[in-house]
């Protein structure tokens, strides 16, 4: 909780922060409370801090007073800052003077209210140690009293940079600096929202280091929308540019600084090269599906960054379909494929792939298993399919804790370079999580999967089950699949780019005929029946079918068959 703005207390001096370890980011206020501008931790005053505040004595320093330093009593004088390239006239205009107290020289910056009264000062010695006098509150801006509205105002981190910009503009145009530096830029700018809103443009000329760039992003978010410009300098800050002969570059930024654009928003005008590169990249060209050309006609394939949902009733051919696509993409197209088949062991997955590749149902034939081991074909088949290290499998049968699974999928993409990852199936991930709210769990998981696919450019194929209909025939008996039949959360259909449904009547007179229906395709907008495939019991493949009968004749067959082995 940030209470630093609500208190009438005044800032005393900087102290170390026990929470984040900053040596001087923490601030002690007159009522004893502290606030760290680095980690933003607010701590209420206790007896210890109240006692320190009452003494107002920073470590190694001299007792301070609530009163500002008097120009005459402090042997004050206005002087050019020759080492900084700043004239006496500029210092006098801004209220930046030299004091000599107890034989020690100080630079003093007067902070004034809009009536011109000095309310606080920032005092700096030759070793760059700072302290303040008076009521140095969170809205402190050096030079604020000089300007009231206009076309542009420049905001710098420190007083020296502010004086530099004033010098180059002959003290004619608005410029201020942050009273508490870059670490408090957001708080200072937020506290001065109405003041900054008087200007048409607000130019943030912060330091070019990491802290300065971070401060720009934080401050810009709390300033009037559409008015913020960001200066980019060739040196660390405005004064360093001035000392190195880059005055022209400073003024160029005053007049032509680019607008601040928040993360996530880009100008289309800036995308020419990115679009040119994308048009010729593999991500913009779809990976084609096998088994049914109509899928490609309606979807134009699967593109990088897309989530492809495959669904059907139980035992309808989902796993066979995705294994077939994996084999096609890995062998014919040379893509690297990751498979997380959570309902089977990696041995079973590999055996099915070997069988498909050689057009035999290897796992279902004990005699064939023995034969290829004895005659040496196993090694030949294995090397032909896996010798080029194209396929990578998730080796944790029935273990699908969400974060662990996502970490493994991320490794498949970033560490192994997989172009396609297949997840079979999403329901087992949800059931393994232990969450009581399945809908919420699917929402979170789909959001993470979508973000993963989009951010990495991988094609992510996910298998999803269907919910049981309330009445009427089951999906396993040829019931057409609707996009609302996906089991779980609406996120399944909302976050998927393409949804492919497989339909067949396991008990009909054509139990091996599979209707392919496109329920959604974000890329083309095309939906509907894509065609038919037929399961070949000899080869284990879903092959293109010339069947072109009406959908009703496919879905309403009433004969029964026991062949449900997919």
Swiss-Prot record:
Cofactor remark: Binds 2 Mg(2+), one of which is catalytic.
Residue segments, region Disordered: 543-566
Region (Binding to viral DNA polymerase): 550-566
Biological processes, Gene Ontology terms: DNA replication, synthesis of primer; viral DNA genome replication
Name of a matching Pfam family: DnaB_C
Residues annotated to bind Zn(2+): 17, 20, 36, 39
Signal peptide: none
Binding site for ATP: 312-319
Site (dTTP/dATP binding): 361, 465, 504, 522, 535
InterPro entries according to UniProt: DNA_helicase_DnaB-like_C, Helic-prim_T7_N, Helic_Prim_T7, P-loop_NTPase, Phage_T7_Gp4_N, TOPRIM_DnaG/twinkle, TOPRIM_dom, Twinkle-like
Recorded superkingdom: Viruses
Catalytic reaction list: ATP + H2O = ADP + phosphate + H(+)
Subunit details: Homohexamer. Assembles as a hexamer onto linear or circular ssDNA in the presence of ATP or dTTP. Present in a mixture of heptamers and hexamers in the absence of DNA. Interacts (via C-terminus) with the viral DNA polymerase that is bound to DNA; this interaction is essential to initiate leading-strand DNA synthesis. The priming complex consists of 2 DNA polymerases and 1 helicase-primase hexamer that assemble on the DNA template. Interacts with the single-stranded DNA-binding protein.
Domain free text: The N-terminus zinc finger domain is essential for delivering the primed DNA template to the DNA polymerase. The central core domain contains the primase activity. The C-terminus region is responsible for the helicase activity and binds 1 Mg(2+)-dTTP.
Family: Belongs to the Teseptimavirus DNA helicase/primase family.
Record's protein name: DNA helicase/primase
The species this protein was found in: Escherichia phage T7 (Bacteriophage T7)
């Amino acid at each position: 909780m940030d209470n630093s703005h609500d208190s009438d207390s005044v800032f005393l001096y900087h102290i170390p922060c026990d929470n984040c370890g900053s040596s001087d980011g923490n601030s002690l206020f007159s009522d004893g409370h502290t606030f760290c501008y680095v980690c933003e931790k607010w701590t209420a005053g206790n007896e210890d801090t109240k006692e320190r505040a009452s003494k107002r004595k920073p470590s190694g320093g001299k007792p301070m007073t609530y009163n500002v330093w008097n120009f005459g009593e402090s042997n004050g004088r206005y002087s050019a800052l020759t080492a900084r390239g700043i004239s006496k006239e500029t210092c006098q205009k801004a209220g930046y003077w030299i004091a000599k107290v107890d034989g020690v020289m100080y630079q003093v910056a007067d902070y004034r209210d809009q009536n011109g009264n000095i309310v606080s000062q920032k005092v700096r010695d030759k070793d760059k140690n700072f302290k303040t006098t008076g009521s140095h509150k969170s809205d402190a801006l050096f030079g604020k009293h000089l300007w009231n509205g206009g076309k542009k105002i420049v905001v710098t981190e420190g007083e020296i940079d502010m004086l530099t910009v004033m010098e180059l503009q002959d003290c004619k145009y608005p410029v201020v600096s942050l009273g508490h530096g870059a670490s408090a830029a957001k708080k200072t700018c937020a506290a001065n929202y109405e003041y900054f809103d008087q200007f048409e443009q607000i130019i943030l000329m912060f330091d070019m280091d990491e802290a300065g760039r971070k401060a720009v992003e934080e401050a810009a978010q709390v300033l009037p929308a559409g008015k913020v410009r960001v200066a980019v300098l060739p040196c660390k800050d405005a004064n360093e540019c001035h000392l190195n002969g880059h005055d022209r570059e400073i003024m160029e930024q005053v007049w032509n600084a680019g607008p601040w654009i928040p993360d996530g928003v880009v100008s289309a005008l800036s995308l020419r090269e990115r679009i040119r590169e994308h048009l010729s990249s593999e991500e913009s060209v779809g990976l084609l599906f096998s088994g049914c050309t109509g899928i490609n006609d309606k979807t134009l394939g699967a593109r990088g960054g897309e989530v492809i949902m495959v669904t059907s009733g139980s035992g309808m051919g989902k796993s066979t379909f995705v294994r077939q696509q994996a084999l096609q993409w890995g062998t014919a197209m040379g893509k690297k494929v990751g498979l997380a088949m959570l309902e089977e062991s990696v041995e079973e997955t590999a055996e099915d792939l070997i069988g498909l590749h050689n057009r035999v149902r290897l796992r279902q034939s004990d005699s064939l298993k023995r034969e290829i081991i004895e005659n040496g074909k196993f090694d030949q088949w294995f090397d032909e399919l896996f010798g080029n290290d194209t396929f990578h499998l998730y080796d944790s049968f029935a273990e699908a804790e969400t974060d662990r699974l996502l970490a493994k999928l991320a490794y498949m993409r970033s560490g192994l370079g997989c172009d396609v990852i297949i997840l079979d199936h999403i329901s087992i991930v949800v059931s393994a999580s232990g969450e009581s709210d399945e809908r919420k769990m699917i929402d979170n998981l789909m959001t993470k999967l979508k973000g993963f696919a989009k951010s990495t450019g991988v094609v992510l194929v996910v298998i999803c089950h269907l919910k049981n209909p309330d009445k009427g025939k089951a999906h396993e008996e040829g019931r057409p699949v609707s996009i609302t039949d996906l089991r779980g959360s609406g996120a399944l259909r909302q976050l998927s780019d393409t949804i492919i449904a497989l339909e067949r009547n396991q008990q009909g007179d054509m139990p091996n005929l599979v209707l392919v229906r496109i329920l959604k395709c974000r890329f083309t907008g095309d939906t509907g029946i894509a065609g038919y495939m037929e399961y070949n019991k000899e080869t284990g493949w879903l092959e293109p079918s010339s069947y072109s009968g009406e959908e009703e004749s496919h879905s309403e067959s009433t004969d029964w068959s026991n062949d449900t082995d997919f």
